[in-house]
Amino acid sequence: MYSFGGGMLNLAATLEYSAKTNPSDPALYFSGKMISYAEVNIMANKIANGLLSSGIKRGDRVALCCPNIPQFIFAYFGILKAGCVVLPFNVLLKNNEIEFILDNSQASAIICFEGTEELPIANEVKKAFKKSNSCKKMWVIKSLDNFVLGNNICDFSVLSNSEANDFNTVQCSSEDTAIILYTSGTTGKPKGAELTHA
């Protein structure tokens, strides 16, 4: 594990290490386009800057409901860089399941994909967001331009359009929670499994 001095670390350091040592190497391919480690790191920095400037703070839990698209990776590492906890969950969940996870985890915010006509992800998330007691901010990765934004519901570009390409990653300890993965809940309510930065 690549860590900061003094025993402090952050899982996002793995991305930063790759961006520093192999900046032009491919981090991922999407729709025939290569995205380098340096590009992923810059986008994660922009999102981390956007999160903190929106009032999200170290230790806050940020839910992420998104399919396998580049924005998932950018947001995932941006959340970690900001010292927040990533809370990824399945795009097929219905609003009552999403609401349970948001409130059970005490998520402060959620980033979600708008979806498709067949799978309108953001519509389900919006219903849960409006009923949630803990979640106060929602950002939508637009895909169809059909989704109506509203009070505390913004376009993802608000986060990703930060002018700053740099970010001082928040240092965490090995005991700090980095990710919470929820079980499927097949035998009862889903349970959150916490993973640390270690």
Task: Give the residues covered by each predicted segment.
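Short hydrophobic alpha-helices that are characteristic scaffold elements of the AMP-binding
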Residues: 77-82, 103-104
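Conserved S/T- and glycine-rich ATP-binding loop of Class I adenylate-forming
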Residues: 62, 79, 110, 177, ...
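Conserved AMP-binding/adenylate-forming core of the ANL superfamily
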Residues: 3-11, 24-69, 73-77, 94-99, ...
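Conserved ATP-dependent adenylate/AMP-binding module captured primarily in the ANL superfamily
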Residues: 87, 93-127
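Conserved pre-ATP/AMP-binding loop-to-beta segment of ANL
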Residues: 24-26, 139-140, 161-182, 189, ...
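ANL superfamily adenylate-forming
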Residues: 32, 116-174
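Short acidic/polar active-site loop segments enriched in Thr and Asp
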Residues: 57, 108, 136
